[in-house]
Amino acid sequence: AGETYRYFCWAVKDENDPYSFEPTVVQENLPKKRAELEEQYGITIKYIINDAQDWAAKVMEASLAGTPITDILHGGGPFAMLNIYNFSSTGGRLLLQLDEYSDYADFSDPSWWRTELQQSGYFNGHQYFAVPNVIGIEHVALNQVCIFNKSLLESAGYPADKLYEMNQSGEWTWDKFYEVAISCTNPDTGTIGVNVGDSFSLIHSLFSSAGARAVTSETKDGATEVTFTPNTPEALEAWDFFIKLGQAGAVDYRHASGDVEIFLSGNVGMICTYFNRVINIASSKRHPEYGILFPPKQEVEDEYTSDVNWFTPYAAMSQISNPAGAVQLLSLYCAPLYSAEDERNQASVEAELMQ
């Protein structure tokens, strides 16, 4: 009782308004959860603002110096995990091993935690990161989709109804995708077939549909080996198709989170990216009429894949005053608002899709 637990999230710029980046259902309910936990345990949850461009370096350098600025760390995304774990070659010494605190926290319940994805948070046999389940619109927000400009594709001979029919019948393949991308590429009018999406989402979707993995990991005798595997036979098939598109002049290589603005320009036929970009596109008053398809599959007989290559990892720092309390609070505060079986999950999805 009486303790203050510090919580760092890269998106928080104002400690008095730390929820603005969250989905609506979280914005509405997380403050209540925070207040309930503070009252129940007699603690204070203090948000640490991010005032640095390289937030991970800020947090980890402070811990490296022996003066951690936070107890609980929002890990940003999977891209940051390895750097956080092995910052300055520390091999996890700046983080707590969550599995060592099983008397205080349980991260093994799939009703609350993404246990399969959590495997990526294990290094050398110990768990350093917890990955909570998602709720509401987040269930589909990070799935990969293909968003298309209806007007551009129709003028190229591919009306929306025809595309939806291909999608539904299982004929939306790499070959059809290539055909459509070429058809709506016109250097004279400045239109181009497909944008690569946020952080080259297109190649991620091609990898997924080909059954390739860019990174693989294997743990033997308590030691984890992570291998970069962009050159397997399956991966090379994806690269070859991507290069073929590029050689035909049908690829717009601009990428990063500005992919929404790129699509809103109206001169890009398709964009492979996260489903949550649809929310941003729809909220714009100047958006072109758009449709949504699965990312293309390699062959007709294959299944469609809409992979989720993003999740939110959480960690607790070492060298803090109450490590057991921090891990326990992480398991309570960073867990989703509702369990996977809670009917409020589906209700919140429907409510947010209607907004």
Feature map (PLM): residue ranges:
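Short, solvent-exposed loop/beta-turn-alpha elements that line the ligand-binding surface or hinge
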Residues: 103-112, 155, 167-169, 213-237, ...
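Glycine-centered hinge/linker elements that transmit conformational signals in sensory
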Residues: 174, 178-183, 217-255
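Conserved N-terminal structural module of periplasmic/extracytoplasmic solute-binding proteins
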Residues: 1-88, 340-341
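Short helix-initiation/N-cap motifs at beta->coil->alpha
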Residues: 50-58, 169-176, 252-264
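Extracytoplasmic/periplasmic solute-binding protein
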Residues: 8, 67-73, 122-146, 154, ...
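Extracytoplasmic/periplasmic substrate-recognition and gating elements
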Residues: 283-352
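Hinge/lid segment of periplasmic solute-binding proteins
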Residues: 1-3, 10, 51-53, 81-144, ...
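Paired acidic/hydrophobic, glycine-rich loop segments that form the ligand-binding mouth/hinge
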Residues: 70-74, 269-274
